[in-house]
Structure formats: structure tokens, C-alpha cells
């Protein structure tokens, strides 16, 4: 029994405990070593990260990047619609293929189920290689496992990732299009973009089978004529708390966690902070999920002043909820920005409602965004550590979906996410404990039922 791995939640708790005892929290130089050890991937030094919070501007920048690309364009998305924006992206990809570039599109078969075959032929007939991830009729046993990533990589040097799918509702500014959604993307360069290309390559080879009948299956090895990408190698077991870097292990304090009877190591000596750092987190079923949970737990444990989270689908496991409320109880300014009645999935909103009483009692401030449909997925800790990507705080993102996120350790990016969060609060409504207690009995009943089935949503 002693050789068995502990439950995922316990491993995440270890990461939380290790971060709790860093003197500087997420700003502590040892925090960088901590999250890198949790994930096992490289920590990148890179040019400034650009935050894109307006859909129209984000897609203008991305299509411009496609138009100036010289060798390769890789697009991976959960939803690719055959609407106005989707057609514009299609045309940009066709133009790139006409210039002789290698252009590859990977879309989820369920997310893009409403897209007509003629749209895909409008890509494949002009030299774009397309694959659909896990068609239900081809892979019925894997129906729940979806490719929820959203990323664009150009020449393995410039990349974009975040929460935006390809559809008119994502790509229109809320100032110009009443039905637009509020979402967030980031632009990264250098070695981060190269790793995101490796993420795409891994997803491409997992999407078995061609996009359309009659097309041949083409593996990534057959497509890739440039030097092969070095895919990420993760450690075989969760490394904490016994594998912290030697540089920060010289003076360690130990205390006994009486509740769990486990040793939590405390880092006393730290080094000089480095420059901006970015960590790519790309969990998928069978790999990277516990690392993703560990990094989130470390962010919650490392918060010292404020912890601001934006998520459209909030249905976390009990352990994650307890770590969130623990931060509020120790005096951290914890705020949650969640969707209002304009949500696209009302049942998940009611599942989130089932946790409101616990959150409010712990001192977490809860807001509902009312200006548009909320779809952004961001977390910013102490104005320094920012987590941006496709992952929601729900069971699907934790256990079923392939996701793509970037953890940015940088004050400038943190300040930008902070500013965006505060701007979003100006068009949001705060939920008070008194108002919450006054909700109707049918509302309470629906919240309880949805909360009970949150693992299936």
C-alpha cells in the first residue's frame, strides 16, 4: 500500500502546502522552481506577453499573422463555425496554402458538429490539411474526451492561445456586436510558440482518421518537413514535496500536518528573482491533469494579497473549493467573476450557485458579469502570476478534455489581467449573502440538483 500513488487531491494539497510556506508567495523565486517541478515542462524566458480581450481585435491580429507567415500555420480549436468569421479565417488559411505554406487545421468533431462538410472541402480542396478530433461514430467509447484547446501557431515563432473559438460570437467586439462574448486570448513568441507547436503535433497524432471520407490519413511525421519538435517529457510521478531544487533545499523547515500526518517542507532560503517566465500547461486525459491541478493548488497556496478568477463554468471538485475558501479565510482578497443569466449553459451556472453559500460564508466576493456572455478563463494572483487559457474550473477540464494554458510570471502581464478584471467588474453585479438567502425555493432546488450532478456537466 505504501507504494500506491496518493489521490490526485492529496498531491494537489502537497503543492498547496509547499506554496503556502514560501515567504514571498508567487513572487518568491522558489515559486518558479516549484511550478516547474510540478509540471515537468520547461520554464520559458520570452518577449512580453500580449493580452487580447477584444474579439474583433484578436482575430484581426491573428489573421494578419496568418497572412504574413512564411512557412507554416497551425490552427487547433474546439469550435470552427462556417459563419462569417469562420469563412474569413478559412479564406486566410487558403491564402496561406496558396503561398506554399504547410497549413494544418485540427478541430473537435463534437464542438464543430454543426459545420457543414462543404466548409471542410473549402479548405482541403485548396491544400489545407484538416483533421477532426474523435468523431463520435468512429470513437464511441471516447465520446466524452474532447479537444478543448484553442491555439494558433505561425512559423513556430508566434502563437496565440486562450478561450476563443472560431465563430462570430467570439470575434466581434462587444462595442459593435450585441451578441458578442467576453473572452481572452494571449499572444506569445519565441520558445513558448515552439512548445505550443509541439502541443499541436501531439494533438494531431491523437486525432485518428481524416476529416472527410475519401481523404488519406496523414501523420504528423509525414507532414513535418522541418526539424522535428521535441515533445514534452513529464516526470513519472508527482515530485512534491521531496523533489524541490537543491538550490532551495539547503535550509528547510519541517512541520507536521496533524490532519493528514504528512510532512510539508518549508523553504526558508530563496534566490534572486529572474525575469519574465512562462510555463505551458497542456493537460489531456492520461497525462498532465494532476500537474494542472497541482499548479492551480500552488497558485491558491501562494496567494498573499489577492486572488481574482474569471471563469464561465464553475463546478470544481470539493478539494479545489476548500483550497479556494481557505485563501479567503486567511485574509486574501478572493474574487470570482462568473456568468449571469446570459450564460450559454444555464445548468452549469446553477451548479456554481450550489457553491455560493460556502464561498460567501468564507469571505469570497462573487460577481456575475452582465454585459455579455462570459467565456474568459483567467486567474491572476497578487498582480504577478497569471493563468490564461482554455481550462474551466470544472470536472470536464480537470479530467476529460485536452486543454491548453499558459502560466505567466510577470508583473506587466499581471497588471494587465488585473486591469481587465476590474474593468469587467464595472459591468457586473455583486452577489451578497442577504440577497442569496432570499432566493426562491425552486431556485434553491435547481441549484442543489445541479450541484449534485456537477461531475457530469
Where are the model-predicted features located?
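Short, glycine/polar-rich helix-capping loops at beta-to-alpha or helix-loop-helix junctions
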Residues: 352-355
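N-terminal localization/anchoring segments of enzymes in phospholipid and broader phosphate metabolism
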Residues: 1-298, 302, 326, 340-343, ...
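Active-site donor-binding acidic/aromatic loop of nucleotide-activated sugar
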Residues: 366-370
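Short glycine/threonine-rich loop-to-helix capping motif typified by GTGT followed
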Residues: 322, 348-350
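Residues at the starts of beta-strands that form the adenosine-phosphate
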Residues: 102-103, 333-335
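Helical hairpin unit composed of two closely spaced alpha helices linked by a short loop
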Residues: 313-316, 320-334
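Catalytic-core elements of nucleic-acid end-processing and repair enzymes
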Residues: 377
Amino acid at each position: 500500500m505504501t507504494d500506491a500513488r496518493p489521490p490526485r487531491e492529496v498531491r494537489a494539497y502537497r503543492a498547496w502546502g509547499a506554496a503556502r510556506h514560501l515567504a514571498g508567495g508567487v513572487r518568491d523565486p522558489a515559486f518558479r522552481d516549484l511550478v516547474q517541478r510540478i509540471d515537468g515542462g520547461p520554464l520559458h524566458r520570452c518577449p512580453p506577453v500580449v493580452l487580447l480581450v477584444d474579439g474583433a481585435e484578436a482575430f484581426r491580429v491573428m489573421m494578419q499573422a496568418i497572412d504574413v507567415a512564411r512557412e507554416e500555420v497551425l490552427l487547433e480549436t474546439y469550435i470552427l463555425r462556417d459563419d462569417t468569421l469562420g469563412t474569413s479565417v478559412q479564406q486566410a488559411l487558403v491564402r496561406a496554402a496558396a503561398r506554399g505554406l504547410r497549413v494544418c487545421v485540427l478541430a473537435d468533431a463534437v464542438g464543430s458538429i454543426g459545420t457543414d462538410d462543404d466548409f471542410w472541402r473549402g479548405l482541403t480542396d485548396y491544400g489545407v490539411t484538416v483533421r477532426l478530433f474523435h468523431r463520435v461514430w468512429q470513437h464511441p467509447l471516447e465520446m466524452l474526451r474532447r479537444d478543448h484547446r484553442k491555439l494558433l501557431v505561425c512559423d513556430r515563432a508566434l502563437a496565440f492561445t486562450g478561450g476563443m473559438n472560431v465563430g462570430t460570437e467570439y470575434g466581434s467586439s462587444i462595442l459593435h456586436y450585441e451578441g458578442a462574448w467576453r473572452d481572452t486570448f494571449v499572444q506569445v513568441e519565441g520558445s513558448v510558440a515552439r512548445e505550443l507547436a509541439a502541443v499541436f503535433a501531439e494533438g494531431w497524432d491523437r486525432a485518428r482518421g481524416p476529416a472527410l471520407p475519401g481523404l488519406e490519413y496523414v501523420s504528423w511525421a509525414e507532414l513535418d518537413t522541418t526539424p522535428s519538435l521535441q515533445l514534452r517529457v513529464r516526470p513519472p510521478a508527482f515530485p512534491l514535496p521531496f523533489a524541490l531544487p537543491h538550490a532551495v533545499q539547503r535550509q528547510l523547515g519541517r512541520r507536521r500536518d496533524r490532519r493528514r500526518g504528512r510532512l510539508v517542507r518549508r523553504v526558508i532560503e530563496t534566490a534572486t528573482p529572474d525575469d519574465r517566465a512562462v510555463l505551458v500547461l497542456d493537460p489531456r486525459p492520461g497525462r498532465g491533469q494532476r500537474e494542472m491541478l497541482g499548479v492551480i493548488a500552488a497558485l491558491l497556496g501562494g496567494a498573499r494579497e489577492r486572488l481574482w478568477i474569471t471563469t464561465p463554468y464553475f463546478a470544481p471538485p470539493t478539494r479545489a473549493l476548500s483550497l479556494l475558501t481557505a485563501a479567503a479565510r486567511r485574509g486574501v482578497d478572493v474574487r470570482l467573476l462568473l456568468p449571469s443569466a446570459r450564460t450559454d449553459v444555464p445548468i452549469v451556472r446553477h451548479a456554481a450557485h450550489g457553491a455560493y453559500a460556502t464561498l460567501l460564508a468564507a469571505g469570497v466576493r462573487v460577481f456575475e458579469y452582465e454585459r455579455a456572455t462570459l467565456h474568459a478563463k483567467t486567474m491572476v494572483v497578487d498582480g504577478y502570476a497569471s493563468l490564461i487559457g482554455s481550462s474551466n474550473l470544472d470536472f470536464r477540464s480537470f479530467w476529460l478534455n485536452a486543454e491548453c494554458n499558459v502560466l505567466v510570471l510577470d508583473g506587466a502581464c499581471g497588471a494587465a489581467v488585473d486591469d481587465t478584471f476590474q474593468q469587467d467588474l464595472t459591468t457586473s453585479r455583486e452577489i451578497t449573502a442577504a440577497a442569496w438567502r432570499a432566493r426562491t425555493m425552486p431556485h434553491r432546488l435547481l441549484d442543489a440538483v445541479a450541484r449534485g450532478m456537477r461531475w457530469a456537466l
